[in-house]
Amino acid sequence: MSENSSDSDSSCGWTVISHEGSDIEMLNSVTPTNSCEPAPECSSLEQEELQALQLEQGESSQNGTVLMEETAYPALEETSSTIEAEEEKIPEDNIYIGTASDDSDIVTLEPPKLEEIGNQEVVIVEEAQSSEDFNMGSSSSSQYTFCQPETVFSSQPSDDESSSDETSNQPSPAFRRRRARKKTVSTSESEDRLVAEQETEPSKESKRQFSSGLNKCVILALVIAVSMGFGHFYGTIQIQKRQQLVRKIHEDELNDMKDYLSQCQQEQGSFIDYKSLKENLARCWTLTEAEKMSFETQKTNLATENQYLRVSLEKEEKALSSLQEELNKLREQIRILEDKGTSTELVKENQKLKQHLEEEKQKKHSFLSQRETLLTEAKMLKRELERERLVTTALRGELQQLSGSQLHGKSDSPNVYTEKKEIAILRERLTELERKLTFEQQRSDLWERLYVEAKDQSGKQETDGKKKVGRGNHRAKNKSKETFLGSVKETFDAMKNSTKEFVRHHKEKIKQAKEAVKENLKKFSDSVKSTFRHFKDTTKNIFDEKGNKRFGATKAAAEKPRTVFSDYLHPQYKAPTENHHNRGPTMQNDGRKEKPVHFKEFRKNTNSRKCSPGHACRENSHSFRKACYGVFDCAQQESISLFNTVVNPIRMDEFRQIIQRYMLKELDTFCHWNELDRFINKFFLNGVFIHDQKLFTDFVNDVKDYLRNMKEYQVDNDGVFEKLDEYIYRHFFGHTFSPPYGPSRPDKKQRMVNIENSRHRKQEQKHLQPQPYKREGKWHKYGRTNGRQMANLEIELGQLPFDPQY
């Protein structure tokens, strides 16, 4: 060995040289004297083993096979068993002895035999297979460093080789370590070294055997260490890979679980959504079914309503065509009248009628004054009757005295018997006179109420009175000779004369009443005639305003506004020449002109208590429907013509509320709501007033009359219902309504007298007037009345509803 310290361990022909600061120059095996050189063989064996290890490492790295930690230990046991078998096979004489040079510090291992080399190659290949992954120069499991030796093939032996090398025919590879500083070896020194080696061979054989065993142990330890390091390293890698694999598997499982949970949540949410959608669909289905049913019902209802409207439209078209025809006829009639030039004549007649109206008013006032005088005369007659009653009572007392004196006288004489008879006759006459007095008293009372009431009864009493008076006169003449009855005779004569005077006076009053009634009838007919003539003139201006200019009418007549009531007032208007010979039931008997009485105000007042939607009201509105069509049209025309405002049809609930407000305002209590509702309901159809059948102003007047005729409000009512119509008109139309032809109501005192007189007059009409005609002609169809109703009308109305300005 040289100065530099070097450590060398050898086993199985391997020489491990550890030298600091020197390079490997050559590794030669030490050859015995009688054998071949072992160094080249050993070096070639090492080279082959290293190549095999590298090949195995390359294959293992290419295949990428992963061995478990448990496989390292059987491989280690297999390698140890193969090494022991090789040791048994190798004889002692085949042990190579390594030579070491003191100068170069090179230890040369003698190469083994070829067979051993083959066995060693197999073992080394197996070891290399077990430790292929750890030949990476890492010091984690071993402190040794393996490096690939350089094989040097020398074709010619160098000069400085030993004699044993010269004898060798084959070149041998060897590991070389080159040192930093190299000593030159002379031939003499090499020879000396060989000689010394040969001398020390016997002593080193024992060392060689020991070193070979030691090398085996070292190799075994190295193999064990390498295998343990490989196993440890591979185990750690496998554990890490397993851990990574487990983590990856856990992560995958967690991801799968998350995906599954999210999918389950989505499925659950979709299931809930499906349920809600199903419920919504069911609800929508039910709603669509209900809507479909309602649509079908509505469709059927609309179809029926459409059919009904078509039928009603056809009817209305027919009615409209008929109305248009009637309108054309009326226009033709108006044109005919205009062509004849009757407009100026009508104006003249109207002026004459106004003059007659003034005269009639004066006569009416005189008639009222005469009636007052008659009432005062009736009171005077009542007083005279009281006086006559007192006289009769005095005569009765005298008769009783005379009868008593005659009874106390002689009863057997024949004169007494005759006197008794005369007394009995006088008593009978006295009772008759008393009966007459009581009757006359009753008749005078009736005369105070109404002087026309007892016409037939007074006639009967006149005849009865004449007969009884005749009897009394005959008996008085026969017995006038009697002296004791002279005073009685005088009293009876006075009574007879007074009764005759009373009857005569009463008869004269009855005649005067008849004449007053006739005169009243005449006045009434004349006033109606004047009114008719006036409206006749106004109807001419409705359809053609130019007619007045063409025929020279007055400016006032031309400027009069058109009204819808002209057609209502004259539904059957014709020329006077055409209808002059067709007025049978309504002509007057005194040869005067005809007097049409078709006027709304009078008919309304006469039939206000008997009006019903089925009879009188329809008669009132028969001609009004010619001027308007339908409830709305008639209501608007009436409101425009009377109040200059457009109003919709009056509703029943609104009208009832107005009546209730007025009653609560004017009266403390009103107990006839049910009766009033029954009366009002007759004039409303489906809650709306029948404007096409009756005028609303007429209806208000009917309600007013109905309330006045109640017994509770006939006397001492202080005019509670006087302002009812104004209150109703103010509510519906904004202002009150003033009748265009003067006041339609008398004053309060006159109205009370008229109401009381009308009651008794109705009783008298049952006896005085004949039965009405069963068929009164065509005028009765449109509300015409007979003469009896016309005669009573003035008494009920009091002051006539006319004004001289018209």
Curated annotation (Swiss-Prot):
GO CC terms of this entry: membrane
Transmembrane feature ranges: 217-237
Membrane topology annotation: Single-pass type II membrane protein
Residue ranges with Basic residues bias: 175-184, 468-478
Stretches for region Disordered: 80-105, 152-207, 457-478, 758-778
Region (Interaction with MCF2L and SRC): 1-307
Spans within the Lumenal topological domain: 238-806
Keyword list, A-Z: Cell cycle, Coiled coil, Membrane, Phosphoprotein, Signal-anchor, Transmembrane, Transmembrane helix
Subunit composition and interactions: Interacts with MCF2L. May interact with MCF2, ARHGEF1, BCR, VAV1 and FGD1, but not with TIAM1. Interacts with GTP-bound CDC42 and SRC.
Designated name of the protein: Cell cycle progression protein 1
